[in-house]
Amino acid sequence: MQLFAPAKINLSFKILRRREDGFHEIETLMAPISLRDELTIEPNESGFVFSVDDPSLSAGEDNLVVRAARSFFGDVQEEPRVRITLRKKIPHGAGLGGGSSDAASTLLGLNQLYGGRLSSSRLTNVAAGIGSDVPFFLVQSAAWCRGRGEIVEPAAVPSMPILLLKPQFGVSTSWAYQQWRDSRELPGVDFAAQSAGELSLQNDLERPVFEKHIFLAQMKGWLRDQPEVAAALMSGSGSTVFAVLRDSNSADAIAARAREELDPMLWACAAQL
């Protein structure tokens, strides 16, 4: 069985408050994009085997694919007898939800392989126990996510061309949340909501992340200055900044200019909402 795990971007991200359980109450509009990882799941009578083609990622118990598989088999009370192979395209520490998407696709694939043993509501509960973003990826469409992210309401989002830019460094999501309360807006950086068609783009996590990583603020500002760009925003906790393009044919030219003017080592990817 072959499955595809899409990346996501946050089109809107608001932090409402810090909760007593340590999580943050959020409201975010997330949308899957055409960039995606690939998973293969097949029966394996000798037990559970997991491999990933990215040597920088753990293939151990802390990998979200492994956690998802363990959670699924624990819930259905079966011995895990599958081989899962993960081929990565989504960069790590990028704010694109790659690990959460891989976990959700693992749950969906295993549930299909085992005859739909878990109901959709039970699958959602299992997903929420793995990570806050995992329930969103079960929906396989754009959605408003509330609570700590586990309350998911599908939404309609128009298709748009986008360009993703990411520097070599990543950003820790937990660190970004921890810094949010005491962070301040940097002078000269525009944090105001931007319009892109019917959408209003804004991200509350830009404030703490830009304080530490001023380059991301500069990259966002640079993108907004490009005539082919309608809006630009950091996705999630970063370090990816995405641009909504007026024309999909401009992606390569913008990426080339960004590498020339900002950082020759930038990772760039043209994608579609």
Per-range role (PLM):
Residues 1-94, 111-121, 148, 166:
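ATP-binding N-lobe of GHMP and related small-molecule kinases
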Residues 2-4, 12-28, 116-231, 244-273:
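ATP-dependent small-molecule kinase catalytic core of the GHMP/sugar-kinase superfamily
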Residues 44-46, 157, 228, 237:
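Short strand-connecting beta-turns/loops that link adjacent beta-strands
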Residues 45-58, 106, 128, 194-202:
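Short, basic/glycine-rich phosphate-binding loops at helix/coil junctions
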Residues 70, 74, 108, 112, ...:
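Short, well-ordered alpha-helices that flank and scaffold nucleotide-derived cofactor binding pockets
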Residues 85-114, 132, 231-245:
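Glycine/serine-rich anion-binding loops at beta->alpha junctions
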